[in-house]
Amino acid sequence: MTKVITRFAPSPTGMLHVGNIRAALLNWLYAKKHNGQFILRFDDTDLERSKQEYKDAIEEDLKFLNINWDQTFNQLSRLSRYDEIKNLLLDKKRLYACYETPEELELKRKFQLSKGLPPIYDRASLNLTEEQAKKYIEQGRKPHYRFLVNHELINWHDMIKGEVKYDGKALSDPIVIRADGSMTYMLCSVIDDIDYDITHIIRGEDHVSNTAIQIQMFEALNTTPPTFGHLSLIINKDEKISKRVGGFEIATLRKEVGIEAMAIASFFSLLGSSAQILPYKSMEKLANQFEISSFSKSPTIYQPEDLERLNHKLLISLDFDTVKERLKEINAEYIDENFWLSVSPNLQKLRDVKDWWEICHQTPNVENLNLDKEYLKQAAELLPKGEITKDSWSIWTKEITNITGRKGKELFLPLRLALTARESGPEITGVLPLIDREEIIKRLTSA
């Protein structure tokens, strides 16, 4: 059986976002599920927009998610190989020179659209005589090159979409070499996939027409195309998610929002599939259950609050030995197991534990909370004597009810606000023993 080799090929022109991290995850998981290899390739032929800082950020995000790669390379290191294939395809008459300026091409596109026609290149340059081409060159025009798509039926079996058919007549011959001599994604990608023995490619369904063209490129180079799988798009309300829309970056989720790596990995590798989205604790366990056939053909809605809920489920499922290592990473190694167990059931983000440590160890500011001072002073007098334990809260509140007649929110909320300055949070039953007795009385009497 052929060894499975997948790849993730980001362009270092922006940050990783929830749309393309999904492709990275699924390619990695598919490779690991089948004991294969995963390759990281940087499509950096866009010299103007590609930046080292984006490449570094992409690698940082992948490492954060424990997406490790067996090989990595960038397309700029393979230009001589691309030139070799360019000459081969020119000899085969599958590439042809074009001399239209961007402005002329835009005029053609607008004209076609005004007539209700699809903006497909009209192949005007395909039939240029040598004399006409020479005239353009004398005018100072530099040619760009297009791949000649055969006008025939293109079909393949897609891992997600099933049987896919494309009419070659509906496809525009793509530009594969720009006028400045640089290569575009389309052909370089095929050459790389051939040379690195890529067997499976999982990517967004916005690449379906690219796949149809690239299948002809593989065949023009006498190579069997890889197996393709096209994921339905992730949408947020009414727009698809892409880096051009902005937001939803992985770096933002981990640095600013505070989502755990395995919450991100679990969520986006299961989103859009028939599998239940659960908080897996390791990439290996996630890979073991992974099934590419479980993914839907329909668009998938991404709601950030669902990710945050999964993050909460992951946090409360972690054993303290695992938590200890994560606490070190956020400079909160002073948190002990007792404190963690007391506050973790209500944590949405790991970093929230630092806030609760501060709440328990530093008197909160309650000046603007309009608290009932007489009630709180009365409650302070009724605080059980001796050591504060997890039983103290129920004993205390029963006594308050007996003396004041208060119940429910009227009883609990003023106490919570005076003690924590928060309307919600971990159960006060567990929080109360974390605050020194003298501090409890101070907070109640000075509110």
Curated annotation (Swiss-Prot):
Presence of keyword Methyltransferase: no
Organism placement in taxonomy: Bacteria, Pseudomonadati, Pseudomonadota, Alphaproteobacteria, Rickettsiales
Family in the record: Belongs to the class-I aminoacyl-tRNA synthetase family. Glutamate--tRNA ligase type 1 subfamily.
Keywords: Aminoacyl-tRNA synthetase, ATP-binding, Cytoplasm, Ligase, Nucleotide-binding, Protein biosynthesis
Motif ('HIGH' region): 10-20
Cleaved signal peptide residues: none
Biological process per Gene Ontology, one example term: glutamyl-tRNA aminoacylation
Subcellular location: Cytoplasm
Reactions that this protein is recorded to catalyse: tRNA(Glu) + L-glutamate + ATP = L-glutamyl-tRNA(Glu) + AMP + diphosphate
EC number of the protein: 6.1.1.17
Pfam families xref list: Anticodon_2, tRNA-synt_1c
Domain of life: Bacteria
Quaternary context: Monomer.
Residue positions binding ATP: 243
Motif ('KMSKS' region): 240-244
Function: Catalyzes the attachment of glutamate to tRNA(Glu) in a two-step reaction: glutamate is first activated by ATP to form Glu-AMP and then transferred to the acceptor end of tRNA(Glu).
Record organism: Rickettsia massiliae (strain Mtu5)
PROSITE patterns: AA_TRNA_LIGASE_I
GO MF assignments: ATP binding; glutamate-tRNA ligase activity; tRNA binding; zinc ion binding
Name the record gives this protein: Glutamate--tRNA ligase 1
Protein biosynthesis in keyword set: yes
GO cellular component: cytoplasm
InterPro entries assigned: aa-tRNA-synth_I_cd-bd, aa-tRNA-synth_I_codon-bd_sub2, aa-tRNA-synth_I_CS, aa_tRNA-synth_I_cd-bd_sf, Glu-tRNA-ligase_bac/mito, Glu/Gln-tRNA-synth, Glu/Gln-tRNA-synth_Ib_cat-dom, GluQ/Sye
Primary enzyme class: ligase
